[in-house]
Structure formats: C-alpha cells, structure tokens
UniProtKB/Swiss-Prot annotation:
The gene is CHI4. It catalyses: Random endo-hydrolysis of N-acetyl-beta-D-glucosaminide (1->4)-beta-linkages in chitin and chitodextrins. This is Endochitinase PR4. GO terms for molecular function: chitin binding; endochitinase activity. Disulfide bonds join C26-C34, C28-C40, C33-C47, C51-C56, C88-C137, C150-C160, C238-C270. Belongs to the glycosyl hydrolase 19 family. Chitinase class I subfamily. Residues 24-58 form the Chitin-binding type-1 domain. One of its GO terms (biological process) is cell wall macromolecule catabolic process. InterPro entries: Chitin-bd_1, Chitin-binding_1_CS, Endochitinase-like_sf, Glyco_hydro_19, Glyco_hydro_19_cat, Lysozyme-like_dom_sf. Its EC number is 3.2.1.14.
C-alpha cells in the first residue's frame, strides 16, 4: 500500500507540469551567457558564478581521479530500482551497466574535487533521477504525449516535427525541443527527428541525463543541493512554489549521502 501511494504521488508530480522549466530561458544567442537562474546576458551576473552556458568566466576545477564505478555500486542503484513496482516499465530498462557506459561520454561527472565532492554529486544526481522517474519506474512522462513541448521562440534553431513529441523522457525527464536538439547533437542521435530514442536506448537515455546535468547543473553544484533543484525545475518548485516537492528531493539526497557516507553540505533547499 505504501509503495502504491508513493507511486501515485510521483505520478501526480509528473503530470503537474513541464520539466526543466528554468532551461526555457537558456539557448542564448552567440556571445551571451546563460546565468545560474536561466537568463541571457553579459557581465559577471550572467557569466560569473553559476553560469550555465556561453562564455562563462568562472573556470571549473580540474578533474580528480575518483572512480565513479567504485562509488556507484550495484547495491546502491539496485536499492533504488527495487523500490519501483514490479510492473514499472523502467524497472527492466535502467541498469548500472548502461549508466557506466554513458559515463564514457561524460568522464568529468563525479570527478571534480575530493572523493566527498564526488559522492555528493552522485547523490545529488540520483536524488533527482529518483524523483523524476519514481525510483526509475517511468521512462516517459505520464501523459506527456498529450502536451505541447515545442517552444516557439527557439523553433527557428530547433524546428519541431509535427509528428513527434518532446515531452519528458529518461532519468532527468528531458523536455522541450531546445533540449532535445542539442542533446541529440552532443550524443549522436536525431533529437528533433527521433526524440523517442531517449525512451528506446537506455545508454542514450542516461547520456541525455548526463548531458543536461553537465550543461545546466554542474555549474552550480558547489552552491549546494538547493541550487541543483533550481537548475532543474526552479520555476515550478523554488521560492515557495512547491515546498513539498523540494523537500522530497532533499530527502532523497540526504538518504543517498547517508548511504555513501558523506555529509550533505549546506544550502539544501531553494
């Protein structure tokens, strides 16, 4: 009964609104930076701390030698997936091997800073993956195909196909044409012409989640877990918009930090 209630609550959360809403303000013109809050411009407020895209002025620290596979054990991931109902489509889709394979394209993930920093980044990413997918139950957003995720302002650069849907898919629930386009280009698939690839190829599915993470979340990871919430779905959740959902994400993060044996750090909410 408890698990069913959790799945119902997750389903409601997935239906409530589009994912990655803060990213709607990114996709800036050449020469402009996308700020940590998702707005385009120049200067330190846009290109400094938390800058997500463009000619950012804040340099990233060099990669460390921490090994993700040693931190992300089979027991850790299976402990999450095992909480999904047996009938969930994602239960037999998402695997540790697929995630590790996707990591070959994003070797800096979880490898900046100390081992504790690596553990916190992995805990943060999987807290969001857990929340977005209901413990890896869902591959696609519930009723997502019935929603319009074609952003008119970016349609010239990322043209939508009338026969395709750009609703939430994969661990991060990648959404919108302006995300599918560049995610496809970065990961060698046709994001605009074949967005369903994210639902059909588990390695690509994880790659798109890692792409989004490295593009939009990694730049703010040193500001605390709350900043990662803002980077993923801040417009719908932060600043009092949905404190229950924020707390749910924080609870997952706190639990995964506990499992990995690392302190959560400060600034957990947004």
């Amino acid at each position: 009964m408890g698990n069913k209630l959790v799945l119902v609550l997750v389903a409601v959360a997935l239906v409530m609104g589009p994912k990655n809403v803060s990213a709607q303000n990114c996709g800036c013109a050449e020469g402009l930076c996308c700020s940590q809050y998702g707005y385009c411009g120049t200067g330190e407020d846009y290109c400094g701390t938390g800058c997500q895209q463009g000619p950012c002025t804040t340099a990233s620290p060099p990669p460390s030698n921490n090994v993700n596979a040693d931190i992300l054990t089979a027991d850790f991931l299976n402990g999450i997936i095992d909480q999904a109902d047996s009938g969930c489509a994602g239960k037999n889709f998402y695997t540790r091997d697929a995630f590790l394979s996707a990591l070959n394209s994003y070797t800096d993930f979880g490898r900046v800073g100390s081992e504790d920093d690596s553990k916190r980044e992995i805990a943060a990413a999987f807290a969001h993956f857990t929340h977005e997918t209901g413990h890896f139950c869902y591959i696609e957003e519930i009723d997502g195909a019935s929603k319009d995720y074609c952003d008119e302002e970016s349609i010239a650069q990322y043209p939508c196909s009338s026969s395709k849907g750009y609703h939430g898919r994969g661990p991060i629930q990648l959404s919108w044409n302006f995300n599918y386009g560049p995610a496809g280009s970065a990961n060698n698939f046709d994001g605009l012409g074949a967005p369903e690839t994210v639902s059909n190829d588990v390695v690509v599915s994880f790659k798109t989640a890692l792409w989004y993470w490295m593009q939009h979340v990694r730049p703010v990871i040193n500001q605390g877990f709350g900043a990662t919430i803002r980077a993923i779905n801040g417009a719908l959740e932060c600043d009092g918009a949905n404190p229950t959902t924020v707390q749910a994400r924080v609870n997952y993060y706190t639990e995964y930090c506990r499992q990995l044996g690392v302190a959560t750090g400060d600034n957990l909410t947004c």
